[in-house]
UniProtKB/Swiss-Prot annotation:
SUPFAM superfamilies named among the record's database cross-references: 2-isopropylmalate synthase LeuA, allosteric (dimerisation) domain, Aldolase
GO CC list: cytosol
GO molecular function: 2-isopropylmalate synthase activity; metal ion binding
Organism of origin: Buchnera aphidicola subsp. Thelaxes suberi
Pfam families: HCS_D2, HMGL-like, LeuA_dimer
First-tier enzyme category under EC: transferase
Gene coding for it: leuA
Similarity comment: family membership: Belongs to the alpha-IPM synthase/homocitrate synthase family. LeuA type 1 subfamily.
Pathway: Amino-acid biosynthesis; L-leucine biosynthesis; L-leucine from 3-methyl-2-oxobutanoate: step 1/4
The protein, known as: 2-isopropylmalate synthase
Coiled coil ranges: none
Chain segments carrying region Regulatory domain: 250-375
InterPro entries, per database record: 2-IPM_HCS-like (IPR050073), 2-isopropylmalate_synth_dimer (IPR013709), AIPM/Hcit_synth_CS (IPR002034), Aldolase_TIM (IPR013785), LeuA/HCS_post-cat (IPR054691), LeuA_allosteric_dom_sf (IPR036230), PYR_CT (IPR000891)
Chief location bin: cytoplasm
Function: Catalyzes the condensation of the acetyl group of acetyl-CoA with 3-methyl-2-oxobutanoate (2-ketoisovalerate) to form 3-carboxy-3-hydroxy-4-methylpentanoate (2-isopropylmalate).
Amino acid sequence: GRTSIDNLCRIVESAIKAGATTINIPDTVGYTIPSQFKTIIKNLFNKVPNINNAIISAHCHDDLGLAVGNAIASIEAGVRQIEGTISGIGERAGNTALEEVILTIKLKEELLNVFTNIKHNELYRTSQLISQLCNTPIPANKSIIGSNAFAHSSGIHQDGILKNRANYEIIDPKTIGVKAVQLNLTSRSGRAAVKHHMHEMGYQDDDYDLNQLYVNFLKLADKKGQVFDYDLEALAFISNQEDKDQEHFQLKYFSIHSGSTGVSTASVKLLCGNKILNEIITTRNGPINSIYQALNNIAGLPIVLEKFHLVGKGEGRDALGQVDIVVKYNNRKFHGIGLATDIIESSIKAMLNVLNNIWLSNKIKSKIKNIKNKK
């Protein structure tokens, strides 16, 4: 946008005469808008006599948030190669997000009159891998590959999705390798979403009172934000008096010894119901791994840690550390959160949160089984 079109045409023509087979047209500082970039490309095709002897490529930056828009506009003008990166990773505000261009082409193939041979079902997995390798977290609201891209929390949207997914999804999540759509339970969720989650857990309509469950759900959602499946179970089947039993595993003491040798020793003491249990574990995989092994040995549950995320809350030496974890148990996912100035303590709190949720879920399953056996 900052180079005169006549100069650009002369440069492109000379480069092709010199043997260039691909000519890249860059918007290096993300300065142009789609209509402007489209005009530039059209002028090249109209004014450069040997333009068809080379592939014209576009290289756009996202300084104004228009990289993908400019890339699509350039395709409409005749460009046949787009330079970009997964997630738009790049200099300053980033480059063209390839996954957005790829999916746009797939959905608008007839309109754009172009196609790609990309394996679309590898997009999500590839983006996750690149995020890990580059240590660049993917924003939850990122188009196509963000965790919220196929997540629905509005009651109207959730009801529409359950009736016909095409109502609020322009593409099947499986197309890019996402296994399932998410219906997040929040204070905006309706009865249909709550009922759907209960059915997904195997409960029938006559197992619980949906109206009462929904009233209790809204109260919890207002306090907690997002409600998980095991929260619903507790609301549906555990009375207020029994809520006191939820903290079955309580921390009484912990100690960590770790040094430059790479060996960590964790000692932990828990109150489990009315029993005090101790465990000491030594590992070579760090203090958190040691303490988690010790906790798991006490709980005796076949759990698998799938996600561990640590983020600082505040600044300075007295800042809080928040640990969020996701644990898999019996093909279900349980979430835990812990907050403390000591990251080991916050890690323990997060795991105890998970263990207590699992314990309560097992208690509910046992209770329901006994009721059905009596019938």
